[in-house]
Every structure is written in structure tokens, then in C-alpha cells.
Amino acid sequence: MSQQLKTKMVKTVPSYTGTLRSHSLSLPHCVSECSGIRIFGKRIKSLAFTTDVAIVKNINADAIMAVYPFTPQPVIADAIISVADVPVFVGVGGGVTSGMRSDRLAIQAEHQGAFGVVLNAPIPNDVVRMIKEDVDIPVVVTVVAEST
């Protein structure tokens, strides 16, 4: 039985950047070769890790991961979500911020339109479970060591 070789057809996509937006940040083209992950029917191949709203508005990433080393505040999540043209994953706790506070922040982030919430290590497993039970969006947990 002979195997048929599949050739990948190269697509030409028209592109327009405009004069004022020609200085936006572009991710490397090789990102398009990644498989990515599909969440709620949207395929995400790239994440920009930033809380800078100017970068959020001027980068061609498929999603934004907005995590910062301070106590999460709904007003910051709302500002980033309202500026972004793409899905946003917002930080809702870890370390100092945990328990019911992280749970309420996650619920509020979901109501604000976040695509997912992020918990930074260290975070107790029971808090992760509690948040997962209360929201219907992805819960991402950072891992810093094999034992966590």
C-alpha cells in the first residue's frame, strides 16, 4: 500500500497595517505553526504576559495574561479587559491573597468578561478547587517546583 504525501498549501493572506498602527508589536511568525489550545471555541496560540494597556492594545497576541506582583484589584482587571481586543486571563491571587478573597475576585473577573483566571504559587489546592467550583472559566495555576 503506498502512502500519499500530504503537501501543505501555503495561503496568502492580505494584510493591512495602516499608517498610525504600523508600529504595533508583532509576535514571531513561527507562532502560527503551534497547535495552541482551544478555549470556548477560540484557538489561542500565543499569550502576551503584560498589564500595560498600551501593549495590550498594540500587540497581535491571541490572548493576554495579566498577572502582577500585588494584591489583585477588580479595577485593574476591568481596565485591561475593557482595553483588550482579545481574551484576557487575569490574576486573582496566590501567596498573600488567597481563600475567599481569591474566590470572590475570580467570580468578579468572570463577570467582568475575563476568559480565565490565574493563581500564582503558592496557593492551597483547596482554594483552587473552590474557585473551579464557582466559576465556569479556566483556572490556570503557576507551578514553581515539582512539589507544588
Residue ranges and their predicted role:
Residues S35-R43, A63-A66, V88-V92, V117-L119, ...:
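Hydrophobic faces of well-ordered beta-strands that scaffold small-molecule active sites
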Residues K6, L27-E33, D52-N58, I81-D85, ...:
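Generic detector of short, locally flexible boundary/turn motifs and exposed helical patches
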Residues Y68-A84, T97-S102, N120-D136, A145-T148:
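Active-site-adjacent beta->alpha loops and helix N-cap segments on the catalytic face
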Residues T50-T71, Q108-G113:
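Catalytic domains of carbohydrate-active enzymes, especially glycoside hydrolases
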Residues I44-I55, G99-Q108, S147-T148:
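Short, acidic/polar
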Residues S2-A48, A77:
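N-terminal amphipathic alpha-helix/helix-capping segment at the start of soluble metabolic enzymes
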Residues V88-G91, T97-L119:
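Glycine/small-residue-rich loop that forms an oxyanion/phosphate-binding "nest" at active or ligand-binding sites
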Residues N60-A61, A84-P87, Q112-F115, V135-V139:
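Glycine-enriched alpha-helix->loop->beta-strand junction motifs that scaffold or abut catalytic
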